[in-house]
Amino acid sequence: FKFIKNSNLFIRYNYDDNITKLISSNCDCRVIWGSDKTVEKIKEFSIQTTCKELIFPDRYSMSLINLNNFSKMKSKDYLDLAKKFYLDALLFDQNACSSPHLIIWCGKKNEKSYNKFWDNLNIAVKEGKYFIPNEKNKFDKYNKLCEFAAKRKEIKKSINGSYISRMILKKIPKDIDIFRVGFGYFFEYFVKDLKKIKTSISPKIQTLTYYGFKESDLRNFVYRERPNGIDRIVPVGRALEFGELWDGYDLIRNLSKIIDLK
C-alpha cells in the first residue's frame, strides 16, 4: 500500500478561514461533511469551476415496521429484532445520520406485540451496555419532551421511561427532521398502508430501515411515489453499514477522474 500512502496527505488545523480558503481554491474535488451550518460556512469559499463537490449535510432517518407481519413473530424473534434496532439507533446514541428517530408502524396495531417490541428493546439496552444515559441525559430528554408537548400540536401522547422515551404523533409535520432528541428518544406514527407515508418523506430523510416488508413492496412504493427523500432502504440492523453508495452519491465514481477513450 506504499503507493496509496504516498499519494495521501491528511491535514488537521483549528478553525482558520484563510487555510480553508486556500485549500478550497486549489482542490479538484471538495467533500463537505458536517452540519447544515458547517456546509453553509464552507460553501462561502470558492472552488475552481472544474472542481467536483460532494455535500453531506444534516440528515434524518426513520424505521418502517409492518405491524401485520410483526404480530406473527415468535417470542424469541422480538428480542432479536430489538437487538438489531438497538445497534441501529443506540450504538452511537442516535448521533449517526442513519440512526432512526422516527418509527412508522404500518398496518393493524396489535397492542400486545407492539408492547413486546419496547419491552425487548429495554432488555437489549440493559444487555448491550453501550447506551447508559447519565442524569444530565435524562434531564435533557425530559426537558425536550416537555418542550415538544407544550409547543407542537402534532403530539398525541408521550411515554417517558428510564432508558427509552417515546412520543406518538397525530400526524407527521413537514419539519419532521427537527423532531430529534437522542438519548433513546423516539417518535412514533401509525398508518394503515404504505401510501399514507408519502407526505412524511422530506428531502432530509436519508435512511429508511424496515422490517416485515418484501423488497418488491418497497421497490414498488419507490417507483410509484417517487419520494423526494430517502437515499437508502435497508433491513433493521444494517443502518450503520457504510458503503460506496451514500446519500445518493456513488463515492468511487464521483471522486475519480474518468477519461472516456473510444
Where do the language-model regions lie?
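NAD(P)-dependent aldehyde/semialdehyde dehydrogenase
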Residues: 92-209, 216-261
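Short, mixed-charge, low-aromatic patches
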Residues: 33-42, 70-78, 151-157, 174-180, ...
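Short, conserved catalytic or adaptor-binding loops enriched in Gly and charged residues
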Residues: 1-4, 45-46, 178-179, 224-226
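Conserved NAD(P)+-binding/catalytic subdomain of aldehyde/semialdehyde dehydrogenases
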Residues: 3-102, 107, 237, 245-262
